[in-house]
From Swiss-Prot:
This is L-rhamnonate dehydratase. Substrate binds at residues 22, 48, 338. Binds 1 Mg(2+) ion per subunit. The record marks 291 as: Increases basicity of active site His. Its EC number is 4.2.1.90. Disulfide bonds: none annotated. Catalyzes the dehydration of L-rhamnonate to 2-keto-3-deoxy-L-rhamnonate (KDR). Its cofactor is Mg(2+). Pfam families: MR_MLE_C (PF13378), MR_MLE_N (PF02746). CDD domains: MR_like_2.
Length: 392
């Protein structure tokens, strides 16, 4: 079978709901008083958008093959990411065979080492990589999970991230992850409010439902350690992303010091096999949580997963909807998945990338069979207005 080549790469941007899931209207739970690295400043505590968490916006990348097939993916990156794709990365994609994904990844990564390695550059590389997998699977008329080796389980089960784990339990999810609302700068009173909120939720969901805390890089080691010990009596399953991503030493100490049986998780804002190698070799966590749209795409996530598997560490990717689902269903060391509750009050199940994507699957009763539609099985919504800020 002769494989087509890639004739065009396009980078588009979108504002509002989409891959940049923080870009929401006022009143959404995700923009509430939630602890962040900026919570040390009172003027930036009440709303995460106040310090610009949503400034990037969504990046949509399309790759078109010589036979007219179009693959696409969405990630966070907006106009900055679009510039990187159009003005730098496109040269490594156009003219290549659709099968040469490894070569294209390697060239994109090494060509951007002097200003990249992590952050928006890796978001852009990840988006291109995901679009390439979507394209190849469509050319072959197969789902992406088939290209990754095939399913190892018939269906996925999910925990829910959002403000209402009690409602998530009613919907059939296996657990609920709450955002932490108060950081160290809010002192003893803030700590007590954090614990009171957890205790209230435990009383609502009962003793056997998983409860976790998402700390979003907002804590220091002493505070995180104390929070873990005081939350242990409330049956906290894990404490997530307590520290800045580069504080590997802090994570290693935290993992040593938390109560026996409590899990330490992180990795949402880590990237590449080298970043995750540090987390694994320094024994920083029990579960790694790479975001496939930020860590380097599927090509890199497979390498990250192999490193973790060799050390007996679980890989539970951060969010990412279909881009995670097609991966998780093919890996034994990814036994469940995360679902971000994107309804404003976290009171119903809606697609993560709504309204940008069509045919995006969602869990029913906390479970899902990953579709066998070619590619990632989703379509761009033609009614969503997109812009192409740069061309090459």
């Amino acid at each position: 079978m002769s494989m087509p080549t890639i004739r065009a790469v396009r980078a588009l941007t979108v504002r509002g709901g989409g891959a940049d899931y923080h870009d929401q209207d006022a009143g959404h739970w995700i923009d509430d008083h939630i602890a962040t690295p900026m919570s040390r400043y009172p003027e930036y505590r009440q709303s995460r958008q106040s310090f610009g968490i949503n400034v990037l916006g969504t990046l949509v990348i399309e790759v078109e093959a010589s036979d007219g097939t179009v693959g696409f993916a969405v990630t966070t990156g907006g106009e900055i990411g679009a510039f990187i794709v159009e003005r730098h990365l496109a040269r490594f994609i156009e003219g290549q065979r659709v099968t040469d994904i490894e070569k294209m990844w390697d060239q994109m990564f090494h060509a951007t080492l002097y200003y990249g390695r992590k952050g928006v550059v890796l978001n852009a590389i990840s988006g291109v990589d995901l679009a390439l997998w979507d394209l190849l699977a469509k050319v072959r008329r197969e789902p992406v999970h088939q290209l990754l080796g095939g399913k190892v389980r018939d269906e996925l089960e999910f925990y829910a991230t959002g403000a209402r784990p009690d409602l998530a339990k009613e919907m059939g999810f296996i657990g609920g992850k709450l955002p932490l609302h108060h950081g160290p700068a809010e002192g003893e009173a803030g700590l007590r409010r954090n614990l009171d909120a957890l205790a209230d939720m435990r009383s609502r969901v009962g003793a056997d439902f998983w409860l976790m805390l998402d700390c979003w890089m907002s804590l220091d080691v002493p505070y995180a350690t104390r929070l873990a010990h005081e939350a242990h009596a409330l049956g906290l399953k894990w404490i997530e992303e307590c520290l800045p991503p580069d504080d590997y030493w802090g994570y290693a100490k935290l993992r040593r010091d938390v109560p026996r049986g409590m899990l330490v998780t992180t990795g949402e804002h880590e990237a590449t096999r080298w970043g995750f190698r540090m987390l694994l070799e320094m024994e920083c966590c029990d579960i790694i949580q790479p975001d496939v749209g930020w860590c380097g795409g599927l090509t890199e996530l497979m390498r990250i997963s192999a490193l973790a598997d060799a050390r007996g560490v679980l890989v539970i990717p951060h969010g990412s909807s279909v881009y995670s689902y097609h991966f998780v269903t093919t890996r034994h060391n990814s036994p469940f998945a995360e679902f971000l509750m994107m309804a404003p009050q976290a009171d119903r199940v809606v697609p993560m990338f709504d309204p940008l994507l069509l045919d995006e699957p969602v869990p029913v009763g906390g479970r899902m069979k990953v579709p066998d539609t070619p590619g990632f099985g989703v379509r761009l919504n033609p009614d969503v207005r997109m812009q192409r800020p740069y061309e090459h």
